[in-house]
């Protein structure tokens, strides 16, 4: 059993047994009913990527390719355009969060509001981060924050779930490692937990490659970790499943010091990944 599988089962059990019920919940199911959930607060996990510990479960298949494409949409394209996400990456699941009548920051008609990539572009976040790390890798101010109150007031839209990432550099012997800490306000445990984690591992790997560093540790903090009330059957099924006997890891197949903006989604490869099937179905809360 991988570390991710152990943490996954522990969190499911804790939510089901100790979690409390949501109140005044915002999300809705597609039929218009309120999407209530059981949740815990203050979830934390640590993975040492340099030792092959990756935050992806083997208990069900995870759509890692689409997840990584979303990272490129946010941090390379730096846009909120649903047209870019669909036409360039063939990713469609963000359509449920389209904000009608709000154009994208690149002029396209369809957007998710002033969120995610639009905020990255507005503050030139990636270029500033890379410049800081270039000037002084050991500085302690390497922060990506997507929490922009001005943007929230400017347009409607889903406020970012994974909203803050911090980076630190460590030298161990002759090797330099890049660590990352992801902070998330809210996480749908069964659907999005490993998707979000692996997205930001991919971002960590892209930044490390840009400088020719090794990937180090990945820290993951979630303020509200929940399971929706229409997912309890799937939760029980996941607890019953025996994990696959594999050790999945994400590989970025580009040379060291490849420019961040020259890396492509197809440069990533998930190896030794043989998840348990069949896939489970989930009705998303919007």
UniProtKB/Swiss-Prot annotation:
Q: Where along the chain is (6R)-5,10-methylene-5,6,7,8-tetrahydrofolate bound?
A: 188, 285
Q: Where is the active site?
A: 161
Task: Give the E.C. number(s).
Answer: 2.1.1.45
Q: What class of enzyme is it?
A: transferase
| Binding residue positions for dUMP | 140-141, 185-188, 196, 226-228
> What is this enzyme's catalytic activity, as reactions?
dUMP + (6R)-5,10-methylene-5,6,7,8-tetrahydrofolate = 7,8-dihydrofolate + dTMP
Biological process terms from the Gene Ontology for this record are:
dTMP biosynthetic process; dTTP biosynthetic process; methylation
Known pathway = Pyrimidine metabolism; dTTP biosynthesis
InterPro entries per UniProt: Thymidate_synth/dCMP_Mease (IPR045097), Thymidate_synth/dCMP_Mease_dom (IPR023451), Thymidate_synth/dCMP_Mease_sf (IPR036926), Thymidylate_synthase (IPR000398), Thymidylate_synthase_AS (IPR020940)
Q: Which domain of life is it from?
A: Bacteria
Keywords of the record, alphabetical order, are: Cytoplasm, Methyltransferase, Nucleotide biosynthesis, Transferase
Single GO MF descriptor: thymidylate synthase activity
Kindly list the places in or outside the cell where this protein is found, as annotated in its UniProt entry: Cytoplasm
Any Gene Ontology CC annotation: cytosol
Q: Which family does it belong to?
A: Belongs to the thymidylate synthase family. Bacterial-type ThyA subfamily.
- What this chain does, per the record? Catalyzes the reductive methylation of 2'-deoxyuridine-5'-monophosphate (dUMP) to 2'-deoxythymidine-5'-monophosphate (dTMP) while utilizing 5,10-methylenetetrahydrofolate (mTHF) as the methyl donor and reductant in the reaction, yielding dihydrofolate (DHF) as a by-product. This enzymatic reaction provides an intracellular de novo source of dTMP, an essential precursor for DNA biosynthesis.
What does the subunit section of this Swiss-Prot or TrEMBL entry state?
Homodimer.
What is the protein name for this chain?
Answer: Thymidylate synthase
Gene assigned in the entry:
thyA
């Amino acid at each position: 059993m991988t570390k991710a599988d152990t943490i996954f089962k522990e969190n499911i059990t804790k939510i089901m047994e100790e979690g409390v019920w949501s109140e005044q919940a915002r999300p809705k199911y597609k039929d218009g009913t309120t999407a209530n959930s059981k949740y815990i607060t203050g979830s934390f996990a640590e993975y040492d990527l340099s030792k092959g510990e990756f935050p992806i479960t083997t208990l069900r298949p995870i759509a890692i390719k689409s997840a990584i494409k979303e990272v490129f949409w946010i941090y390379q394209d730096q846009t909120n355009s649903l047209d870019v996400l669909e036409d360039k990456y063939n990713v469609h699941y963000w359509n449920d969060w389209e904000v009608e009548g709000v154009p994208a920051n690149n002029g396209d008609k369809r957007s998710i509001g002033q969120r995610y990539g639009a905020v990255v572009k507005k503050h030139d976040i990636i270029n500033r981060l890379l410049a800081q790390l270039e000037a002084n890798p050991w500085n302690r101010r390497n922060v990506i924050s997507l929490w922009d109150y001005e943007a929230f007031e400017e347009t409607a839209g889903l406020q970012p779930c994974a909203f803050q990432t911090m980076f630190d550099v460590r030298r161990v012997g002759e090797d330099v490692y890049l660590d990352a800490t992801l902070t998330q306000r809210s996480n749908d445990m069964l659907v999005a937990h490993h998707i979000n984690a692996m997205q930001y591992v991919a971002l960590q790997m892209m930044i490390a490659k840009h400088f020719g560093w090794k990937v180090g540790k990945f820290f993951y903090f979630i303020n509200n970790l929940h399971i929706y009330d229409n997912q309890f059957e799937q939760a029980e099924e996941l607890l019953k499943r025996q994990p696959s006997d594999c050790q999945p890891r994400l590989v970025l197949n580009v040379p060291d010091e490849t420019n961040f903006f020259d890396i492509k989604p197809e440069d990533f490869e998930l190896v030794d990944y043989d998840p348990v099937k069949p896939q489970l179905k989930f009705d998303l809360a919007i």
